Amino acid sequence: LEAYASASAVAARAKEQLLAGASSILGPEAQTVTAKRLFEAASQGDVWSLGLIDETADYLAIGITTIVHTVDPGLVVLGGAMNFGGAKSPVGQRFLQRIRDSFRKRSFEYVAAGTTIDFASLGGDAGYLGAAGIARTEYQKSL
């Protein structure tokens, strides 16, 4: 997934396409484009940027489909910087919906029906909260 859906991979694809002549408000920034700038351009309605974000959602959905068919987690939580604004952003909402739709198209129907894909709600504190939860559990075991 890192090769296709990470911030650096998205920026590299954007740079390649912009240098090849893609029509976007980001054209002048081809050499220095970032995933954050792609999100900002998409938020301004840049059609090319939205398309690249959709493509990224499809790549992520392929990875999610593979993982879900392997371990059947029931819940897939997306977090980190590559959520294009998350649930608070129309671009983030579009990104999530595209992932869900692409996942459903690629999955067995019964697997898709039993799987929820959503954004993480804990934000940047998720790691700390998880570590605290593990510490608490281990402490309680020692009593």
Give names to the regions the model predicted:
Residues L1-L143:
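ATP-binding/phosphotransfer module of carbohydrate and carboxylate kinases, centering on a glycine-rich
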